[in-house]
Amino acid sequence: MSLDELSKLSSTMPQFHDLWISGGEPFLRKDLADVIQLFYVHNHVRDVRIPTNGLPTEQTVRIVREILETCSELQLEIDVSIDGFGQTHDRIRAAQGNFEKAMETIAQLENIRTVSPNLTLYINTVITQENKNEVTKLGEHFKQNYDLDGHYFQIIRGDPKDTSLQAVSTKELMQIYQAALPLNFHYTSKLSRKHSRLDGLRRAFWKAGYSFSYDTQFSNYAYGTKWKMPCTAGQTSIVIDYNADIRVCELRKPIGNLRHYGMDFNHFWTSFERRREVDQVKLDKCFCTHICFMYDSMRHSKRVMLWELPKVYLKHKILGLSDKDGFNRTSALTPRPIETKT
């Protein structure tokens, strides 16, 4: 989509807080800072997250600086994809030298963050058959040697071209999540020391949220268990592709193209096509391991926010667990028979 098309789109959208820009590689778009400024000004967006493979270091650094300079109230999160050490990462990403280039990008972004508190820097690791044996060591390596704000660990989702990448056993995934949760707790505590806005209550909800989301992902991956909340894809979030195709979830097929609606978002939002797809999600009882839609559905669920998360937090407090304790004691993650569905 051109900048003019995006300007028309922005002008027809309501105010919203979160904008997540993915790819492809988002930082290959030279006018990315202008795109973000559109939504910052017109729609009052104040939280932007951008994943990157870390390859276009110079352009990434330039754009990040420009975003922070032109959008002074924006919280900008950059998630650098690292799927293993050295050759493992390069092999998974099919790009020789990707790991070293990504490390260079991380170092440059760390330098920017020392003078820009609105920038947060995360690592994102996708768990696959190829890297399952070094994911835990990778997490500890970044914790000990880099000044990061967080590290995400996500089981591979969707239908990859190489289906063997999904061959991670439930036992292996549980062990990885057991090691990942204390790392998440470490970064949450670290953020709370750096940012006064992350008070005790919010910190508690963040920690409970990590436990709950891992439990939900694992149960869905291992047993096909439904979420404890309805999926709100297409109601509280929407996916817009580079070519203006629009879908309620990136794992579902497009339901139209914004150009057919004259780039008028409100026209699309009130359309029969969107309402029909939302109804279809409900009929399909659509549940998956996709953390973006899981997280959005969590925070719009009264049951989760008022019951499930406090329950997880209280369990943590009652058992007297520290941030170093593993996943198996803070959640319901214990092996159980595969559930049959009728």
Each language-model region and where it sits:
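Radical SAM enzyme [4Fe-4S]-AdoMet core and its adjacent flexible, acidic
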Residues: M1, T70-A233, D241-N243, R247, ...
